[in-house]
Regions:
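C-terminal-biased regions
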Residues: 1-87
Length: 87
C-alpha cells in the first residue's frame, strides 16, 4: 500500500517507524506486513487487524515513551472510528 496515495494510513506508518526506533521491531514488522503485504477486502478489515495488533502490544508492553503512547492513541482513534467497540 502506497502511503502517499493513502494518507489516512500515515499515522500507522509513523507508528511503525517509532516502534522500530524504540526496539519493538517484531510488532513493527507485523504492522508493516498487514499494511503493505496483505490484500484486504475492505479498509475496515485492515483497520480492525491493525487495531488488534496495537491492543496486543499495549497489553504486553504497557510502558513506552510519551511520543509512542501518543502515536498508539492516535492510531487507535482512527481504528475506533470504524470499530468503536474494539477491545
Amino acid at each position: 500500500m502506497n502511503s502517499t496515495a493513502n494518507d489516512g494510513y500515515q499515522c500507522f506508518e509513523q507508528l511503525i517507524v517509532n516502534l522500530r526506533a524504540e526496539g519493538h521491531g517484531d510488532v513493527a514488522a507485523k504492522l508493516d506486513y498487514l499494511l503493505h503485504k496483505v490484500a484486504w477486502t475492505t479498509g475496515s478489515e485492515l483497520l480492525g487487524e491493525l487495531g488488534l495488533q496495537i491492543l496486543g502490544f499495549q497489553k504486553n508492553v504497557p510502558t513506552t515513551s510519551a511520543e509512542l503512547q501518543q502515536l498508539l492513541a492516535s492510531c487507535m482513534d482512527i481504528v475506533r472510528q470504524v470499530w468503536p467497540d474494539i477491545k
